[in-house]
Amino acid sequence: MKKLLPIRKSFINQVVASILVVGFTVSASAQKEEVKDKDKDKKESGKIDATDKSTASIKYRRSSLHTMIIEDAKLPKIDIILRTFNEAPFPDKYNDHTVNGKSFNLYDYKDTTAIVAGEELSKKEQKEADKDMSPEINKYFADSKTANKIIAKWFSRKENGAFDMSLIEERGMYDASSQDIAVASSTARGDAMLADAGEELLPNTFVVVNYSKFVSNEPIALAIKNSTYALAATKPGAFKEIAEKAADVLYNKTKDGYSVWTTAYLYQINWNDSTSAVFYQNYWMDDSKIDPAKKEAFEKGDLFKLELLGFQKASILISGLGANAKDEDMIIKNATLKSIDAVYAKLQRKFEKFRTKTPLTSVEPVLAAKIGLKEGVENGDKYEVLEQTVDELGKVNYKRKGVITVEKNKIWNNKFAPGEEPVDEEGNPIKLEYTLDFTSFKGGKGYYPGMLIRQIN
């Protein structure tokens, strides 16, 4: 008898319940012919071009992001997963705020207290430890001074410890007249610039730590099947037979192949009025006045922290692997990228702070933006439309001008790279009914290209 991999009981129970409901529904409607929605997309006049001059130069503030992956040598195919992550393009909706390395070894930061004390973790304790990796991540952040390095990058810290505002000026899109403002300046414009950076730029700095693993589908599929059988045994005869047949169908469909599971932990830097005041008072210096004591204080200090907001999980099914190693590597690589994209989309949907702004690329003939399935867009999702303005002090403000809704079945499928053949979860080629490279919205009026949209609950 094959030993089952540990999986979450709640997950199995949810799937089992779904099978029972589906089984009953199929039984009740077996004689009915399936009705397909034949609504077709109307042809839009003209293709929206992302390089159009009206939108190509749009500048808007993005959140900043540092991405990492956890190394676990015990996992199969980990070399392919790590290589894929390190070679993947950086998410284009964020500023690249990479510091440190892109990965760390899980077992270098495992809690060894129990081992030193001669204690053995119970199976339950080990399972809980494997399920939540935030203690190891937190230890890595503390040992490597990741939060300090994030702040150092924001203020363009040099080897001598001097800071400047060049990166804040660049990402804040302040005009040339603001670039000569020193931190010590008491001008209203200088104060506004610093306050603006503190309110929007630095606090919207995140770290996402990924843990991806390559697993066989069969143990999980078998566990779901067995649990369904056990639950069905308590039901009346006809219902029992229907549920078991539904479980068999699902098992046979999902048992072959593999899946890439990704868990992503989302952290945010703790920049606020208090930390800002301490930074400028105790650590700030420029090239005109180097203070070795301040330099050392910043490097050894623990003022800055990364706060865990939460985590999300996503998986991508691999129905089968190719006959040669090259095909296998490519399949695993694509599945890994898709699982990472999926978990980022879940993080944005779950955590409002992590949501990105996207410019409208067109309002006529259609209201459209360059986001799609890769970002987790769904039918009926609502987005607020924001107009960004800059006041006389250079502070950027956002004013809501309306709310728009994603049009049904008009979502850009950007999960596939240009030239890549679209396939379903079983690896079968599929034909996309909606082939335009933008998502269409409806609602409101008076918008213009360049306005920003952001998802709302």
PLM regions: where:
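Bacterial N-terminal signal peptides that target proteins for export
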Residues: 3-16
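Surface-exposed, polar/charged interaction patches used for macromolecular assembly or partner binding
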Residues: 31-457
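Long, contiguous C-terminal modules that act as interaction/assembly or targeting platforms
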Residues: 1-4, 457
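Bacterial N-terminal signal peptides
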Residues: 15-23
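Sec/Tat signal peptide C-region and signal peptidase I cleavage site
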Residues: 26-30
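Hydrophobic alpha-helical elements and their junctions with loops/disorder across both membrane
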Residues: 24-25, 346
